């Protein structure tokens, strides 16, 4: 798994990649042993473990250094590369620990105290799995449901409803902000889309209080799903939030950082809205290890937290990939604020393909100006314009990765699988073949 753990680390020719700080501000404490002196060598054993060889020929096994995601968030070093350190709380291993514990409790006759294990699958991950195994969207979802339930998972959900909710609230939030801007409150715009954890880390660590008021306050679909599972589902099945173990399957590794934030921690029950995030790549590894004949597995319908479709088929939205925020909010705001119906957005590429803008004109006057800024090079330019009061935009969709979710389209295939793929990503490409399109994570 380590070789696949960060898609970003596998890419080349990336000119705005931010490397970690030279010195970690949360270093591992080294215990000095009495009598230790002289030089020592470190050797890697055949099983991959590290041992220290002293001058007198002695050998001692070295303890592996560990760091939690909360430590990562407190560090001033890496931004999008935090997953390159050893993560102990957000991995498939943690899920298997819970499932193993549940099996032991059931054997001991204590099944009533086992954790209720819930998995929520994002449309992008579902689409990547469908493409990987040459399945339709619906078949991939049902086979994933069957696979996870064979492992011992109790509920498997789709996150479409949470995405609908997040999108609708983002639309309303922008209209509120724009109307306040029209009344003279210039601090309300531009509204910056905030579902990208890498961007959020950068904004908080680098620009702090200055930039935060511009960032949308709407929860991401992942965290909305977390609230629904830990509050609504838990109450429906008669469980407390801390007795529910919630896992989200996401295409973006930085969603692990988002789930680990203290903002989404319930102090009363000492639990997080999302206990664990596993990436699409990790799910593929799980399938290879536990269900090599994945295509032959008997399908099982996904569970329905809220019913999105009577037929059970998935539905989506136009504006797939990274463009979900911008396109839907632009169309909604055009209709709500100016009574203008916009069917197709015409983008204008500025300095590079990762910085595009779209404008609504009424009577020859620009009344709405939106932009999409992907990658830290463009983000830094945007922030500098904001600080100088030179930003002309009312809304900006921000993604830390260059090309937005094009990064995530390569999570199972590598950068050469779709070499000419546009930023709308593999997810939209695959889903539209099945009559479905998606928005954001």
Curated annotation (Swiss-Prot):
The UniProt similarity line reads: Belongs to the NARF family.
User: What keywords does the record list, in alphabetical order?
Assistant: 4Fe-4S, Iron, Iron-sulfur, Metal-binding
Residues bound to [4Fe-4S] cluster 2: 196, 252, 401
BP terms from Gene Ontology:
iron-sulfur cluster assembly
PANTHER family xref list: NITRATE, FORMATE, IRON DEHYDROGENASE
> Which residues take part in binding [4Fe-4S] cluster 1?
24, 72, 75, 78
**Which GO cellular component terms are attached?**
cytosolic [4Fe-4S] assembly targeting complex
**GO terms assigned for molecular function:** 4 iron, 4 sulfur cluster binding; metal ion binding
What task does this protein carry out? Component of the cytosolic iron-sulfur (Fe/S) protein assembly machinery. Required for maturation of extramitochondrial Fe/S proteins.
Matching Pfam families, A to Z?
Fe_hyd_lg_C
Keyword Iron-sulfur attributed? yes
List the InterPro entries hit by this protein, alphabetically.
Answer: Cytosolic_Fe-S_CAF, Fe_hydrogenase, Fe_hydrogenase_lsu_C
- Name of the protein in question: Probable cytosolic Fe-S cluster assembly factor v1g210509
Q: Does the keyword Iron-sulfur apply?
A: yes
């Amino acid at each position: 798994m380590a070789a696949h753990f960060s898609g970003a680390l596998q890419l080349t020719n990336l000119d705005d990649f931010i490397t970690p700080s030279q010195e970690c501000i949360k270093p591992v404490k080294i215990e000095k042993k009495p009598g230790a002196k002289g030089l020592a060598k470190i050797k890697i054993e055949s099983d991959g473990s590290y041992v220290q060889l002293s001058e007198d020929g002695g050998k001692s096994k070295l303890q592996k250094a560990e760091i939690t995601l909360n430590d990562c968030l407190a560090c001033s070093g890496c931004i999008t590369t935090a997953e390159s350190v050893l993560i102990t709380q957000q991995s498939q291993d943690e899920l298997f620990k819970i499932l193993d514990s549940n099996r032991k409790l059931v054997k001991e006759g204590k099944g009533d105290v086992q954790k209720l294990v819930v998995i929520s699958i994002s449309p992008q991950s579902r689409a990547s799995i469908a493409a990987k195994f040459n399945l339709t969207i619906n078949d991939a979802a049902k086979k994933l449901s069957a696979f996870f339930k064979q492992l011992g998972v109790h509920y498997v959900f789709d996150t479409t409803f949470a995405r609908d909710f997040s999108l609708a609230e983002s639309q309303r939030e922008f209209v509120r902000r724009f109307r306040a801007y029209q009344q003279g409150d210039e601090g309300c715009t531009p509204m910056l889309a905030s579902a990208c954890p890498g961007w959020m880390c950068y904004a908080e660590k680098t620009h702090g209080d200055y930039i935060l008021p511009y960032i949308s306050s709407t929860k991401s679909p992942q965290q909305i799903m977390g609230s629904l599972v830990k509050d609504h589902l838990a109450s429906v099945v008669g469980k407390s939030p801390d007795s529910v173990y919630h896992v989200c399957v996401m295409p973006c590794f930085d969603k692990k950082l988002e789930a680990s934030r203290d903002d989404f921690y319930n102090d009363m029950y000492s639990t997080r809205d999302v206990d664990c995030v596993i990436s699409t790549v990790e799910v593929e590894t799980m399938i290879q290890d536990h269900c090599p004949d994945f295509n032959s597995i008997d399908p099982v319908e996904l569970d329905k937290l809220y019913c999105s479709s009577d037929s059970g088929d998935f539905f989506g939205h136009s504006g797939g990939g990274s463009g979900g925020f911008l396109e839907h909010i632009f169309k909604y705001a055009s209709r709500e604020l100016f009574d203008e119906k916009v069917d197709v957005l015409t983008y204008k590429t500025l300095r590079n393909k990762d910085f595009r803008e779209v404008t609504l004109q009424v009577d020859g006057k620009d009344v709405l100006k939106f932009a999409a800024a992907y990658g830290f090079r463009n983000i830094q330019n945007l922030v500098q314009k904001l600080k100088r009061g030179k930003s002309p935009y009312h809304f900006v969709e921000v993604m830390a990765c260059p090309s937005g979710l094009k990064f995530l389209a390569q999570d199972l295939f590598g950068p050469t699988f779709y070499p000419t793929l546009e930023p709308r990503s593999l997810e939209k490409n695959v889903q539209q073949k099945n009559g479905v399109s998606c928005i954001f994570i």
